[in-house]
Amino acid sequence: MHVIDLEFAAIDGVRLAGTLHLPDRPCSPLVIGCHGLLSDRRSPKQLALAQACNREGMAFFRFDHRGCGDSSGVLERDTSLEARCRDLLGAIGHLARRPDVAGPFGLFGSSMGGAVCLAVAARAAVGPIVTFAAPVRSTPLLAAAAAPQVPAEMRRMAEVIGPPFDLAPELPQLRNLLVVHGEADPVVPVAHAREIYAAAAEPKRIVLQPGGDHPMSDPRHQQEFMLAALRWLTA
C-alpha cells in the first residue's frame, strides 16, 4: 500500500490538501471521502475506511475541505454546502486525470460530508455512495441549535454551516446508495435518513443503528458500518 499527500484545487480555485491511499494493484477503483462540518481528513472513520478499502483492493482519497485541516480558507467565512460541493468536484476532476485510479468514483460522506456527496451525486456521474448521519436540509438543525441545553457541537455547527440548504428536490435522482444513521442521533435526527432512503431510486439500502449517536461512538456500530460500507462499495 502507498500513501501520497496531494495538493489540488477546488473548481473555483481554492487550494486544498488531500491524502491518497493506493493498494498494491494497478488502476484501482477509488472511493472519495468527505468529512463532517467540524472535522477534517484525519477523522477516525475516514482513516479506518481508507485502510479497509486498501485491503479490498480499492484506493481511498480523503481531503480537507476549505477552511479545515491543511487546506486554505477560513472555516467561519468560507463554509457552505455549495462551497464544499466545489471542493468535491475539484477532487473528482483532479483524480480523474490520474492513471492509477479508475472511475466512476465511489463517495463516502459523514454528516455534512454526506450532504455534500448527495448534492454532487445528483449532478455528476459517480459510483456507489455511502452516507452516515447525512442531513437533508439545514433549517431544522439551525432551529434546534437555538434551543436551550443543546449539545455544544450543535451550536458550533449552526455558527459555521452557511446559508440554508434543502436537498429534497435532488434525492429522487440518487441511486446506488447506502444510508447509515444512528437512531438516537441528537444532531441530525434519524428522520433525515428515512427521507433520503424513501426518495432515492434502487439500488439502495438503509441501516439504522439502535441507540446510535452522531459520532458513531459504539464500537459495535463502527464494525457494522464498516462491513456494510465495504459490501456496498465492492458490490
Predicted segments, located by residue:
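N-terminal cap/lid segment of alpha/beta-hydrolase-fold proteins
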Residues: 1-25
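Hydrolase active-site cap/lid region
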Residues: 119-161
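Short beta-strand/loop motif that positions the catalytic acidic residue
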Residues: 173-174, 179-181, 185
